[in-house]
Amino acid sequence: SIIRDQIGFEIIGSKDEKNDDQEIINTSLKSLKDLKYSSGTLTIGNVEIFNILISKLDIPKRWKLRLSRHFWREEYFTDLLKRLETNSDVDPTIVEIDKRRYLKMLKENKSSVIAGRSIEEILKRFDKKIRDPRRLSKGRNVSKIIREFLNIKCPINKAANVLNKFFKKYQINLVVDQRYFPTSSNRISKLNVIFSTSFGRQLEYYTGMVFKIDIKSNNKTKNVINGGRYDQLISDLGSKKQVSAVGAALNLNY
């Protein structure tokens, strides 16, 4: 369950994204000073990098929206990747019918209007639909790229290097600077600091940096702090303007 007894702290109206992300993590680290533990891990992820990657992949727009929207639903997301690999969402009968209609309309007067739309406009829509079905190899390749991306896990000071090698390998026009991350220290006090591309899938409102702190006490690993950036949550809750925000919560019943 994500419902817990918590104490939260946040920066509403965040103006300096990177500094404010660092401030939230630093405040989280300070809150550990009175806790007794032998070791722990600060895990950092970033939902924004995933969404940018998806936007650059060679798949139909509807698939980009689908994958970004359901990133946080891990089981369903895995099912989507399987469908992407097999083209199981594409009905060959419907595709063939669309092609026939398209070829028939090519012979008609382009200025004619059907149901409020010109033949020319309808042809453009048909052309897009016909081109949408993917070659099987393309779907498999895109799924492979996404799966490999989500397996990236490394010390935080190697995050930019590992990501950039990955982007270069698959000829993705994207470069990440190490300064993009809130810290480059692999160890802070008793905590190992790692970067994980698959972390951040627990709550759908995160939009950028996400993190958690787990500590080891009495041979048990316990989650004590979770947080991240949620730049759209306040507008989703009714605000007329977008208000950037970043925050975290300390679990009281860990």
Please state what every model-predicted region is:
Residues 1-37, 89-254:
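Positively charged, Gly/Ser-enriched RNA/tRNA-binding surfaces
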Residues 17-19, 39-41, 72-75:
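Short C-terminal domain-edge/linker segments immediately following a structured domain
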Residues 24, 28, 46-49, 67, ...:
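Internal, well-ordered alpha-helical segments in soluble enzyme and binding-protein domains
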Residues 27-35, 48-58:
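Hydrophobic mid-domain F-helix/FG-region of cytochrome P450s
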Residues 41-44, 194:
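Short glycine-rich phosphate-binding loop at a beta-alpha junction
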Residues 43-56, 199-208:
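Beta-rich nucleic-acid/ligand-interaction surfaces
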Residues 58-90, 215-217:
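Acidic, His- and aromatic-enriched active-site or binding-groove loops in soluble protein domains
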